[in-house]
Curated annotation (Swiss-Prot):
Disruption phenotype: Reduced amounts of paucimannosidic N-glycans-containing glycoproteins in roots and, to a lower extent, in leaves. The gene is HEXO1. Optimum pH is 4-5. Keywords: Disulfide bond, Glycoprotein, Glycosidase, Hydrolase, Signal, Vacuole. One of its GO terms (molecular function) is beta-N-acetylhexosaminidase activity. This is Beta-hexosaminidase 1. Its main location: other. It catalyses: Hydrolysis of terminal non-reducing N-acetyl-D-hexosamine residues in N-acetyl-beta-D-hexosaminides. The active site is at E332 (proton donor). Inhibited by N-acetylcastanospermine, 2-acet-amido-1,2-dideoxynojirimycin and PUGNAc. Has a broad substrate specificity. Can use synthetic substrates such as pyridylaminated chitotriose, pyridylaminated chitobiose, p-nitrophenyl-beta-N-acetylglucosaminide, p-nitrophenyl-2-acetamido-2-deoxy-beta-D-glucopyranoside (pNP-GlcNAc), p-nitrophenyl-2-acetamido-2-deoxy-beta-D-galactopyranoside (pNP-GalNAc), 4-methylumbelliferyl-2-acetamido-2-deoxy-beta-D-glucopyranoside (MU-GlcNAc), and 4-methylumbelliferyl-6-sulfo-2-acetamido-2-deoxy-beta-D-glucopyranoside (MU-GlcNAc-6SO(4)) as substrates. It comes from Arabidopsis thaliana (Mouse-ear cress). Belongs to the glycosyl hydrolase 20 family. It is an enzyme of class 3 (hydrolase). Pfam families: Glyco_hydro_20 (PF00728), Glycohydro_20b2 (PF14845).
Length: 541
């Protein structure tokens, strides 16, 4: 067990003795950081932070607009109270030369590249100390190889800062701090589903913003499904006739803005177009995509037009989504009506195909379309289970149904994303945070070379029973449990009693989300997203 983790456990034991008497006070409790950094040390000092703290940048990437925008964003979070940054009181304090321990934040970024792809370096070092004989001015310093590592460091810095209601100032407890941090997995995702229920642009942005607080880095956008097709596709403009209404749609500009907004927070957007099943809505605008009026999905495998439409959709989407991964679905394909539709049945017989052969033909042809547009295909696990040896070797398999699929996929040389429905499907409201937290993506995979093929994991917010009114409180705080599992070291999340090492911090993180305007539900809910049963502190629900 690491020294840092042991120190935390001892501190949490102390906290648990007094937690029934009062709510946590940052000054009297261990560091409430989420997710837990890889390596860190801290002391016992309390430092004050100047509300006019200045940004100092250095390195090839220090001048990035991403850094400047993030600094301004986080200063608004840290100094949001009336006596905070930009307020009259802060200006008076400045004029009176009130002395603060932390007066500047230095951000050093070594690379000037802002390319955001799978595996981008998100490591950072954060140092916070007061002025002393060697330092005339107190400072905090974040050093990172990329702007995206600096973003993660800014989030950690913001979590160290707490507003003191007595002194009406922002303070950092347990200083000095030295943190060296990096993620365990390069892919840490959250799926949203805008087909089952339309989510307005501002709600999607709020989800993305909240993801950045937990250091998640991939938004898996399940844009379309059998119920609705809300996205504008200029090459085939009738497709979005499959939207629920004229007002529940996304323009090309909307989608581009979501991608831009996400990139500013170090988050990739992976789009999904699920084929050949889950596609009934396509035929609202183009009925020829249906095998027949009584067989509306899977899509018609016999027609070149079907694949022309897929190619057109992907060509349009390639202009919007720069991320190297593109999800082609391929799950839950019921082919019964293919064999009961005359022209499809004749097509199958002419090629000596079974319906399973036709399913494989469809998936592989769709993969080649995606690859031709410089995308790496991602498919749900049924494609691997049904015809894994025929999939393109570049395919990333996403697990959802069978617990050992990642074990089997990596053994065959495929990369895998873990998102087992029993634990990481957020629409399963009866799964408590403990089960989410304790679920390990690498279980059963002992070979380090195969472990590397599990690129990460994803919690899935399927939309059948979640719309704008409840989506954020269904996501949070349970998504945070998976976020720490994917970011922090395996040792840190697997050792000790999580009611001591994780629960107090998760309570605090839930309240942090609430304070930042995210309606995260109580941690100790028997059913997710249920409101509190009675009065009480945010830190004890």
């Amino acid at each position: 067990m690491s020294t840092n983790l042991l120190r935390l456990i001892l501190l949490f034991i102390t906290l648990s003795i007094t937690s029934s008497l009062s709510t946590p006070s940052p000054a009297d409790s261990p560091p409430y950081l989420w997710p837990l950094p890889a390596e860190f040390s801290f002391g016992n000092e309390t430092l004050s932070v100047d509300p006019t703290v200045t940004l100092i940048v250095a390195g090839n990437g220090g001048g990035s607009l991403i850094i400047r925008a993030a600094f301004d964003r986080y200063m608004g979070i840290i100094f949001k109270h009336a006596s905070g940054r930009g307020s009259l009181l802060s200006r008076i304090r400045f004029l009176k030369m009130v002395e603060y321990d932390i007066t500047s934040l230095k951000i050093v970024v070594h690379s000037d590249s802002e390319e955001l792809q799978l595996g981008v370096d998100e490591s950072y070092t954060l140092m916070v100390s007061k002025k002393n004989e060697q330092s005339i001015v107190g400072a905090a310093t974040i050093e990172a190889n990329t702007v995206y590592g600096a973003l993660r460091g800014l989030e950690t810095f913001s979590q160290l800062c707490a507003f003191d209601y007595i002194t009406k100032s922002v303070q950092i407890y347990k200083a000095p701090w030295y943190i060296q941090d990096k993620p365990r997995f390069g892919y840490r995702g959250l799926l949203i589903d805008t087909s089952r229920h339309y989510l307005p642009i501002d709600v999607i942005k709020q989800i993305i913003e909240s993801m950045s607080f937990a250091k998640l880095n991939v938004l898996h956008w399940h844009i379309v499904d059998e119920q609705s097709f809300p996205l504008e596709t200029p090459t085939y403009p009738n497709l979005w006739k499959g939207a629920y209404s004229r007002w529940e749609r996304y323009t090309v500009e909307d989608a581009s803005e979501i991608v831009r907004f996400a990139k500013m927070r170090g988050i990739n957007v992976m789009a999904e177009v699920d084929v050949p099943g889950h596609a009934e809505s396509w035929g609202t605008g183009y009925p020829d995509l249906w095998p027949s009026l009584s067989c509306r999905e899977p899509l018609d495998v016999t027609k070149n037009f079907t694949f022309d439409v897929i190619s057109g959709i992907l060509a349009d989407m390639r202009k919007i989504f720069p991320f190297e991964l593109f999800h082609l679905g391929g799950d839950e394909v019921n082919t019964d009506c293919w064999k009961n539709t005359t022209h499809v049945k004749e097509w199958l017989q002419g090629r000596n195909f079974t319906t399973k052969d036709a399913y494989k033909y469809f998936v592989l042809r769709a993969q080649q379309i995606a690859i031709s547009k410089n995308w790496t295909p991602v498919n749900w696990e049924e494609t691997f289970s049904s015809f894994g040896k025929d999939l393109d070797p570049r395919t990333v398999i996403q697990n959802w149904l069978v617990s050992d699929i990642c074990q089997k996929a990596v053994a065959k040389g495929f990369r895998c994303i873990f998102s087992n429905q029993g634990y990481w499907y957020l629409d399963h409201l009866d799964v408590p945070w403990e089960e989410v937290y304790n679920t390990e993506p690498l279980n059963g995979i002992e070979d380090p070379s195969l472990q590397k093929l599990v690129i990460g994991g994803e919690v899935c917010m399927w939309g059948e029973t979640a719309d704008t009114s409840v989506v954020l409180q269904t996501i949070w705080p349970r998504a945070a449990a998976a976020a720490e599992r994917m970011w922090s070291t395996r040792e840190a999340v697997s050792k000790g009693n999580i009611t001591l090492t994780a629960l107090p911090r998760l309570h605090y993180f839930r309240c942090l989300l609430n304070n930042r305007g995210v309606p995260a539900a109580p941690v100790d809910n028997f059913y997710a997203r249920r409101p509190p049963l009675g009065p009480g502190s945010c830190y004890a629900q």
